[in-house]
């Protein structure tokens, strides 16, 4: 029953979601503040934080907005000063020492060796984790297991797809790579010119004129400009 789902994930931030749907009884029951929405493609889950119900001539619609559950880290404060050297360990430690009842489990360490000399003091855990991620190039996310209902906070190293010489390079947009959903192609020749009439100094018959064209064009397809 949804009319639009916008699911934005970020490498070094929780990410957000916006769902627009008809205000059916089922949608009104499901899209309420605090409920979770699961993305089967990325194994991530969002928590609904804000709901709008609008009545129009076409009927009632509901718009639900939320953040991916990594946003829960913003609800805890680092209750001391943390001096971080190993980034992965620090990103886990900031959460584990200040968890205080949050439901996110902690993934096993991958043994990443990125280091820093960073002091985190009395920030939100999310701010501290983001600082370490941006300083090191590591990212973080929360994965959801639909069989157990467990959400797991994980630090990970992303794949650089910007290097054209790398086999992981993905440098184009297309439906096959999932970064374009709808394609609109527009053609037209409103301002198109393919022949330039270039005049030099002088007056009348003494003025030098040259014609430059894109190919051998004539008739209606010949479009001249003066310059």
Model-found features: residue ranges?
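Structured loops at beta-to-helix junctions and adjacent beta-edge loops in soluble globular domains
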Residues: 22, 51, 67-69, 156-158, ...
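Short, ordered beta-strand-loop transition motifs
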Residues: 7-15, 51-62, 143-149
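Terminal peptide-recognition signature
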Residues: 19, 132, 198
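Short beta-strand and beta-hairpin "edge-sheet" elements
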Residues: 37-66, 141, 178
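Juxtamembrane "anchor/assembly" segments of surface/extracellular structural proteins
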Residues: 1-29, 67-71, 221-227
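Charged- and aromatic-enriched interaction segments used to assemble
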Residues: 61, 65-189
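Acidic, small/polar-enriched beta strand-loop surface segments
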Residues: 161-227
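Short coil-to-beta transition motif at edge beta-strands of beta-rich domains
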Residues: 27-38
């Amino acid at each position: 029953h949804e009319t639009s789902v916008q699911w934005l994930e970020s490498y070094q931030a929780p990410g957000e979601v916006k769902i627009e749907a008809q205000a059916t009884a089922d949608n009104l029951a499901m899209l309420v503040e605090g409920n979770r929405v699961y993305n089967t493609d990325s194994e991530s889950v969002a928590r609904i934080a804000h709901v709008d119900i609008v009545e129009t001539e076409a009927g009632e619609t509901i718009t639900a907005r939320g953040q991916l559950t990594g946003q829960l880290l913003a609800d805890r404060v680092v209750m001391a000063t943390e001096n971080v050297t190993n980034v992965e360990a620090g990103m886990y430690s900031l959460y584990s020492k200040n968890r205080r009842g949050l439901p996110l489990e902690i993934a096993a360490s991958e043994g990443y060796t990125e280091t820093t000399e960073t002091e985190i003091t009395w920030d939100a855990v999310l701010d501290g984790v983001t600082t370490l991620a941006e300083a090191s190039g590591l990212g973080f996310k929360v994965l959801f297991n639909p069989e157990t209902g467990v959400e797991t906070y994980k630090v990970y190293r992303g794949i650089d797809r910007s290097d054209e010489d790398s086999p992981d390079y993905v440098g184009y947009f297309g439906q096959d790579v999932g970064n374009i959903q709808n394609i609109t192609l527009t053609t037209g020749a409103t301002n198109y010119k393919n022949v330039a009439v270039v005049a030099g100094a002088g007056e009348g018959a003494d003025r030098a004129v040259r014609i430059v064209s894109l190919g051998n064009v004539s008739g209606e397809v010949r479009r001249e400009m003066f310059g």
